[in-house]
């Protein structure tokens, strides 16, 4: 039916589209048209037509009802309902909406596919998509506001609120009101993790005119009625800007970053994208996101603020630690250095990761693994779920034994968290015995971790300011390809990044930093991992049988694995998927501990799979895990050559006792030190591995031998040396000094060129030995 003159007088022509098979929306989504491939020729051809938006090929188009009924008078709509019926009219409108949605979806898919191809072309030619995004955003902003003119704002707010001033007052209050999770979630179901007394003080000290009032209070309603006639939108926006940029808020943020926050309970998937951390125009410190956890996971905790802004102020830190560790503040409640804030200004969006069931989350994302052990157990769980021997907590008999017991416990934390006893000075006399310290084992870790996070946040903030990266740019966390090569200060910026890596990557950033620095970010292909797991037409090879034999004995002292842990099925799927991805290599012993080590950090097994793929194919030298293990065997000869040059005393002692260093170091290299050293040092080694490359393996081996020089020279038999160097997990290395020595001491001796030269000679000698 063609519309009458009265009905069609307001009919608006829309953009043309391809003919799409019609279907009734009322019958369900199964009748929706399938996606079609749209080409630029189709768009150009359709643009020449003057037909309405949805053109039908069949005779039904003659009886279609126009889709612009919202513009016709009420009388015309009533006549249409009387003539065609409400059901038919509604069905026709629903069909129009469905066809419009289908066309827009196809168009969006078409241009997204083109954009993906262009990005891949840029990467293949060595160009950075970040710079392209930056220039495009600048051009779009310039074309959107010609001649540097900003959009005009109506002087009369009633034009926006429909002549209803009371609505404008509420809109103005909503604009200024800071976002709190309690707006959407009931307070009884959530316990805030961060508590900021300084924030409450700063907000209360501000003038009442600068802060939004409670909409439910009587004073708010009265003041809204009085001010409604004189409110201006421009003044309200300026007021909001001045409030967010005020000195009180700046002081609040400085206090927030000076106080040490507990990162142990944070979900890394919520805080892993630091590009969403933004600051106000007048505040240079990074913003901090408040995270809320379930009330059933942990009761409300007592909080204290420990200042770490100035590293030289050890006096305040000692006194704060004494207060933290005193029995008077225990009260049988878990203690945390974090602070809680029930309300804080909105600081921008936060990237949400995949929803991982709690039972399959790794220990680094959970804080309740400690419930698996009794309080009287002789073992404790570290941050990553490994069982460790509990320091002696027998009651000392004399003051000398008390001090010795305190030093023993602090030595335990020094080896695990990188803090030294000298830092506390004479404050050892004010601390309690080791059981209390063990109950507060997160304190020392939180202090160093919060300092690292602050330094990394500042680095990210400056990096994004340099390249003008916005929330819409999907270039990952670092944009690693442009850190050291772009700009006049690129080299300096790269050295700054490497210094941060040497000091340790914070746990909340570690997952994404590893993905980008290792190259796994670029290897990711949606659906490929599921495709590998779904292959059923292949005959199970010997690799799968070997995987089933090895996974049950992988990381036996970790609660996440240990033969029957929740990580075992995930590890098996990762190893089987890689054996199908690279059948030439298949599976080799050493991959199991590397994959398990990655699953301690990555809740998504797909991310862990691509990390394993990148380590084997990008980070380590070629043919490292091939069946003949030629490259990995040659590297042991290279290491022996470096030991002979740099540590001649140790080399002579090993030769005198007939110790074959290859038999010890071969497992170090093949497992990438994942089950050789303490877990916290292994994570730091991976930080350096993805920054410096495989040269890190040789530098770490030389650092181990040099650090244990006295113990090695004290061994009088080869069996003693084999026994000592084969299990270094419980040895007390100092993480910071160990990593810095491995990164800097051997940087001139152990280089890629020297390794390649020695490796080629070693491979030649091994080939000659095989031929003979």
Swiss-Prot record:
Signal sequence bounds: none
Keyword Secreted tagged: no
Biased composition (Polar residues): 143-161
Region of interest: Disordered: 143-163, 275-294
Keyword Phosphoprotein: yes
Keywords, comma-separated and alphabetical: Phosphoprotein
An MF annotation (GO) of this entry: GTPase activator activity
Classification via PROSITE patterns: TBC_RABGAP (PS50086)
Domain Rab-GAP TBC: 504-693
Feature: compositional bias, Low complexity: 275-291
A biological process term (GO) from this entry: vesicle-mediated transport
Superkingdom per UniProt: Eukaryota
Modified residues (Phosphothreonine): 395
PANTHER family: RAB GTPASE-ACTIVATING PROTEIN 1-LIKE, TBC1 DOMAIN FAMILY MEMBER 2B
Protein name: TBC domain-containing protein C4G8.04
């Amino acid at each position: 039916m063609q519309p009458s003159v009265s009905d069609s007088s307001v009919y608006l022509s829309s953009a043309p589209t391809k003919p799409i098979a019609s279907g009734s929306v009322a019958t369900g989504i199964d009748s929706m048209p399938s996606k079609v491939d749209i080409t630029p020729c189709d768009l150009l051809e359709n643009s020449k037509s003057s037909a309405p938006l949805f053109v039908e090929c069949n005779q039904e188009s003659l009886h279609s009802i126009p889709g612009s009924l919202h513009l016709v008078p009420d009388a015309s709509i009533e006549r249409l309902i009387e003539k065609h019926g409400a059901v038919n009219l509604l069905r026709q409108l629903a069909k129009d909406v469905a066809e419009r949605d289908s066309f827009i979806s196809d168009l969006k898919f078409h241009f997204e596919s083109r954009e993906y191809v262009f990005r891949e072309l840029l990467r293949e030619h060595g160009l950075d998509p970040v710079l392209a995004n930056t220039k495009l955003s600048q051009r779009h902003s310039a074309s959107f506001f010609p001649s540097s003119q900003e959009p005009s704002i109506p002087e009369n707010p009633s034009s926006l609120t429909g002549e209803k001033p009371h609505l404008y007052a509420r809109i103005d209050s909503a604009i200024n009101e800071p976002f709190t999770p309690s707006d959407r979630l009931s307070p009884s179901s959530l316990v805030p993790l961060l508590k900021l007394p300084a924030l409450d003080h700063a907000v209360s000290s501000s003038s009442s005119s600068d802060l939004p009032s409670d909409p439910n209070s009587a004073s708010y309603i009265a003041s809204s009625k009085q001010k409604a006639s004189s409110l201006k939108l421009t003044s309200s926006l300026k007021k909001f800007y001045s409030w967010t940029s005020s000195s009180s808020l700046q002081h609040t943020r400085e206090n927030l970053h000076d106080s040490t926050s507990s990162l142990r309970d944070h979900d890394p998937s919520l805080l892993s994208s630091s590009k969403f951390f933004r600051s106000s125009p007048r505040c240079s410190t990074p913003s901090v996101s408040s995270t809320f956890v379930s009330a059933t996971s942990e009761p409300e905790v007592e909080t204290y603020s420990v200042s770490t802004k100035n590293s030289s102020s050890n006096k305040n830190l000692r006194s704060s630690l004494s207060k933290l560790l005193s029995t008077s503040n225990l009260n049988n409640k878990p203690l945390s250095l974090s602070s809680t804030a029930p309300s804080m200004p909105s600081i921008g969006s936060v990237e949400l990761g995949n929803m991982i069931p709690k039972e399959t989350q790794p220990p680094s994302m959970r804080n309740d693994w400690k419930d698996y052990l009794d309080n009287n157990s002789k073992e404790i769980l570290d941050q990553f779920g490994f069982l460790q021997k509990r320091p002696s907590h027998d009651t000392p008999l004399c003051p000398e034994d008390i001090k010795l017991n305190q030093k023993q416990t602090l030595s335990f934390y020094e080896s695990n968290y990188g803090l030294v006893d000298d830092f506390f000075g004479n404050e050892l006399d004010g601390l309690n015995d080791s059981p209390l310290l063990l109950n507060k084992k997160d304190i020392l870790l939180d202090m160093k971790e919060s300092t690292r996070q602050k330094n990394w946040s500042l680095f990210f903030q400056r990096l994004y300011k340099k390249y003008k990266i916005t929330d819409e740019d999907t270039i990952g966390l670092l944009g690693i390809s442009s850190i050291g090569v772009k700009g006049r200060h690129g080299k300096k910026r790269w050295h700054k990044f490497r210094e941060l890596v040497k000091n340790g990557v914070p746990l909340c950033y570690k997952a994404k930093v590893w993905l980008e620095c290792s190259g796994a970010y670029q290897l990711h292909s949606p659906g490929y991992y599921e495709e590998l797991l779904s292959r059923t037409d292949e005959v199970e090879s010997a690799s799968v049988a070997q995987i089933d034999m090895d996974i049950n004995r992988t990381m036996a002292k970790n609660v996440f694995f240990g033969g029957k842990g929740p990580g075992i099925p995930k590890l098996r799927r990762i190893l089987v998927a890689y054996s199908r991805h690279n059948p030439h290599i298949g599976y080799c012993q050493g991959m199991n501990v590397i994959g398990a080590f990655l699953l301690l950090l990555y809740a998504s097994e797909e991310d862990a799979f691509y990390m394993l793929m990148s380590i084997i194919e990008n980070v380590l030298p070629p043919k490292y895990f091939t069946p003949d293990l030629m490259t990995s065997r040659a590297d042991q000869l290279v290491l022996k050559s470096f030991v002979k040059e740099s540590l001649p005393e140790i080399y002579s002692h090993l030769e005198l006792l007939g110790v074959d260093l290859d038999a010890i170091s071969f497992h170090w290299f093949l497992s990438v030190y994942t089950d050789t050293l303490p877990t916290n040092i292994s994570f730091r080694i991976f930080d350096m591995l993805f920054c410096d490359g495989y040269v890190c393996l040789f530098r770490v081996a030389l650092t181990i031998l040099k650090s244990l020089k006295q113990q090695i020279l004290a061994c009088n038999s080869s069996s003693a040396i084999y026994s000592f160097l084969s299990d270094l997990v419980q040895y007390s290395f100092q993480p910071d000094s160990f990593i810095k020595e491995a990164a800097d001491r051997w940087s001139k001796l152990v280089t890629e060129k020297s390794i390649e030269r020695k490796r080629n000679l070693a491979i030649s000698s091994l080939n000659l030995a095989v031929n003979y």
